[in-house]
From Swiss-Prot:
Additional free-text comment from the UniProt record: Is hydrolyzed by angiotensin-converting enzyme (ACE) by only 7.5% (compared to bradykinin). Not able to contract smooth muscle preparation (ileum).
Domain of life: Eukaryota
Record's protein name: Fulvonin
Compartment annotation: Secreted
Predominant subcellular localization, coarse grouping: secreted
Keywords: Bradykinin receptor impairing toxin, G-protein coupled receptor impairing toxin, Secreted, Toxin
Keyword Secreted: yes
Species in which this protein is naturally found: Cyphononyx dorsalis
Length: 11
């Protein structure tokens, strides 16, 4: 999963 700019981890 990739964390977008310190937000919730999205895949």
């Amino acid at each position: 999963s990739i964390v977008l700019r310190g937000k919730a981890p999205f895949r």
